[in-house]
Design a protein with these regions (language model features):
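A cross-kingdom feature marking charged/low-complexity
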Residues: 38-69
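Short, well-ordered alpha-helical segments
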Residues: 2-37
Length: 69
C-alpha cells in the first residue's frame, strides 16, 4: 500500500467542468499516480454578460517508492 499525498489547486474556466478539467490537466503535467479529487470551493466572477468560474480542488496522488543506492 502506497502513501497518499494531497495538494490544493485552483482551476478557472467558462464553466465549472472546464475549471475542474483545467486543474486536473495541469496536475497531470507534473504529478504521477493521481487517484482522486474533491471540489473544495466553487466561485464565480461576472464581467458584463460573461461569467467565469473558479474551482478549488484537493487532488490526491500516490507517492512513488524509489530505491536509492
Amino acid at each position: 500500500v502506497g502513501v497518499q499525498k494531497a495538494i490544493d489547486l485552483i482551476g478557472t474556466g467558462n464553466s465549472i467542468q472546464d475549471a475542474v478539467t483545467e486543474a486536473l490537466d495541469r496536475a497531470r503535467l507534473s504529478l504521477e499516480g493521481i487517484t482522486s479529487f474533491e471540489v473544495q470551493r466553487i466561485s464565480g466572477v461576472v464581467d458584463g454578460s460573461t461569467a467565469g468560474y473558479e474551482v478549488q480542488l484537493r487532488i490526491w496522488f500516490t507517492l512513488l517508492e524509489r530505491m536509492h543506492g
